[in-house]
Amino acid sequence: MIIPIDVKPPKRVEKAWGHELWIHNDEEYCGKLLVFEKEMANFSMHYHLKKKETWYIQQGSFQFNWIDVEDGLHDSRIIKEGDSVLIERGQPHQLISLQENSIVFEVSTQHFDEDSYRIYRGTPNDLL
């Protein structure tokens, strides 16, 4: 059986922190580029119940924040070009770009808009 090849541009989704380029999203997997256009751009601390994701830092660097689900404490680490990170289901996480035009290649299980649970907007420092 011959399966036709589908060539098309990615879907662009505008975000407050930049934009996403959706390469593919279906019941098997999702692939996206997350483009943080400005330094210190960030998405909210959030988690997913259905989605498991892996990030590859393609360009730039980020402060990667997460909440330890065992003790509720915040933790953070600088991640840079060439690093990869696995985000398990239910793991609260956040990225803050440290350079303009920082890019993450994300591969995950299927993306559902309703599967994003925000804990807070802004950065941990905004909570103080």
Regions found by a protein language model. Give the residues of each.
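Double-stranded beta-helix
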Residues: 94-128
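A short, N-terminal "cap"/entry segment at the start of jelly-roll beta-barrel domains
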Residues: 1-33, 44, 77, 121-128
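Short, surface-exposed beta-strand-loop junctions and turns on beta-sheet-rich folds
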Residues: 51, 70-72, 110-112
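Glycine- and acidic-residue-biased ligand/ion/polar-headgroup-sensing regions
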Residues: 49-69
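Conserved short histidine dyad/triad with adjacent acidic residue
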Residues: 33-51
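Short beta-strand His + acidic residue motifs that chelate non-heme Fe in jelly-roll/DSBH
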Residues: 43-46, 64-66, 86-87, 93-98, ...
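Short acidic-glycine-tyrosine-enriched beta hairpin
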Residues: 68-89
